[in-house]
Amino acid sequence: LQNCYPNLHGGDFSIANEFRILLMNISIIAVNCFVMISGYFRIRQSIHSFWSLYIQLIFYSALFSVIGYSFGELSLQDTLLRIFFPFTEGGMWFMVAYLGLYLISPILNIGYQYLNAFQRNILLGCFIIVDIYLGYMHQSPEVSVDGYHVVHFLCLYYIGMYISTMRKCRTNLKLGLSWSAIVILMTMMHAIKMVWFPITILYSMRYNSPMVMFASVVFFMWVQTWKLQSKTINWIAVSVLSVYVIHSQPVVSSLFFDF
């Protein structure tokens, strides 16, 4: 999927291409949901949590950077920069944005506690306007073009906090069907925009496009209703960040990406 990603938007209509689009629409919400989970449970800053994350980054960056240097894919300077500055020199946009969120989150946590229901709704609207209208529809690089920005993560974090204080929906079937319908609609919109391009104002495979945001929130609320207890799922959950860091290393990504 990632291999063909640059061609998905401009590719001719075909069943095979639309099936790839469908799979992308199903999976693209993962990043948004990961950040919303952080907001739902709140980030708790501590030396231990930061050090644990930093050690994890240094370990994988050092391991694969040395391998890359050994195979001539990285210079000595790039190797040392990736080892000692894994957040900023590793080419991992997610880690840079998440670090910004990690540092700012205590302010959001404390501020949210002192807001009443009306103020929380107003602030939610403000975040959505900044992230979706200015960042996506207006394509303002100062804000959050395509969602690769800490502003988008702050919006998602706030949405996660907001959902945590909402009354949980008991009708998981309706939420599941709603999410499925949204994903199918997104796939149809992709086919339509081949003919009528202006529809991209509502949908494209960008993290802060309106339809992707809507699908992320509905899926997140649906997952809330699940009652699962699985060691395997927990193991996969804690491994997600490691998988992202590993696949972002040049020596690994070159095996999958040809662009």
Which role does the model predict for each range below?
Residues 120-167:
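Loop-centered beta-sheet repeat module
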Residues 1-3, 60-69, 124-139, 179-194, ...:
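Aromatic-anchored segments of alpha-helical transmembrane domains
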Residues 17, 21-92, 96-97, 101, ...:
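Transmembrane alpha-helical segments and their boundary/interface "anchor" motifs
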